[in-house]
Amino acid sequence: MLSTLALTGCQIESSTTTTATQQPSVSDASHYQSIIDAAQGKPSMDVLRVYISQEPLLTDPAQHQANIDSLWLMLTQMKPEQIQGIEADENILLGWVDLLDIYQNNKDDPEALRTGIDDWKTRYPHNPGAKNLPTALVQGTITKVGANPRIALFLPMSGQGQVFGQAIMQGFLDAQKGLPSSPVSQASTAPAASQGSGNDVLDQIYQEVAATVNENANTEVASSTVSIDAVPTNTQSVKVFDTQGKAMPQLVAQATSEGYNLIVGPLLKSDVQAIAQMNAPVNVLALNELDANQLQPRTNLCYFSLSPEDEAKNAANQMRLEGKQMPLVLVPASPFGDRIAKAFAEEWQAKGGGTALMQTFGSTASLKESINRGQGIRMTGTPINVATQGVEQANGSIDAVYIVATRDELTLVKPMIEMAISSRQRPALYASSRSNQGNSNADYRFEMEGVKFSEVPLLAGANNNLRKQAQGKVNNDYSLFRLYAMGIDAWSLANNYDNLQNNGQFRVNGASGMLSVHENCVIYRELPWLQFKQGQVKPAQ
């Protein structure tokens, strides 16, 4: 039965490569998939023909690539004696078999394999693999980056994202020159910051990076034990490519043709999606992260971002270390807030905690209305639903609150929490770096007494000389300090790229956090914690 159905598919394939006398319906794709499923992965020429017949019917890029990858996997698993009986007019199948021969003869020589594939593409221009090579085959054409990679930096250097691209570029290029040494005293004075941009696109990125600032004052961070590692040395020239309004395939082709073997960037998520879907034979350290359901293990693609989800995971870990049992996550009423709450709950439960609770708040204006009416924030919430089995239902009183808010919001949220509970039942308060603007005066610091918050090492007293250097490069715009720190760490990661893929124990004390590598080569940042205590900002105890 399988053979009969597969041969029917072969007839459709043959027609699509010659006269195309019939147009198969989209429903045929499901029909072919049922044949593939019935084969249960057992390699055969019949199933290869079904994959070939199904391929032109798949319009979704992910499904189309999966078809090609599955065909190639099956082909590489077949023994030579199984690859028999190919008709003269089966051009697509003949092309795949020829490509297999090229791969087997050159799989230990990436350069020769690339040359062979390029020649194959000229001989089989209509084969679907000529446009979309199998992912596994692409991986075989990629050489290791090595100790001195030639780096192409993909950033928005014009248009609305220019300010962010420039901050990252400055950190990256300053790291190439080497970081200033840390002074003997680690006491640090954080600089003032400017207003937000007022631009929708820029403000969207600010939401992911930091809050805007509207005062001019200084915040002193007490002596800190946080450190930033020395950066690698690489004298190869770095070329910056402006991604604004540019198509990723053209930029990647230009960079590789000029001899660059590592791309750092792009920054915008849409560009990261585009470069990931290209399946290009070049190593990439993307400066943003895709959603979890879009990540796939690739030996030439890593992700590094200033992820607010990482901060939420940091908070969950910190609370567990301090013995907290019943957390409440207080976030904006938005998809952004939902993402943060989910990330916190997943990490909380992964570390042995029970169900975490969530409560949302509205705009600053609505918070002010509530506080004027004497309405506080009660320590209640709804369970955060995450796909975890066997987690106990939350019980008892809230003993810790993780607040994701801007400074203006936090100045309202904290007293609203205190209004609703007695002083003997007050939970420990934790905030994200979103609330830290480095410009708090003494009144604010006393008002925030006891609040703990996470922050990047560059702004947590790790290296005062480096902070002063950064201050001049980002024009005292405090929100850009974190992006400058990201640029420094992108340099360190780029020059350790081979270790990211091959060393699960890789660690570096970076300017944006303690960096480690998680699944799918996603870089995770662990941040130090600070605390408002007696009118000062000190390392959290």
Residue ranges: model-predicted function:
Residues 68-171, 177-186, 196-237:
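Long amphipathic alpha-helical scaffold segments
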Residues 259-268, 285-287, 328-332, 380-407, ...:
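Periplasmic-binding protein-like
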Residues 414-488:
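Extracellular/periplasmic periplasmic-binding protein-like sensory domains
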Residues 474-540:
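Segments of small-molecule ligand-sensing domains
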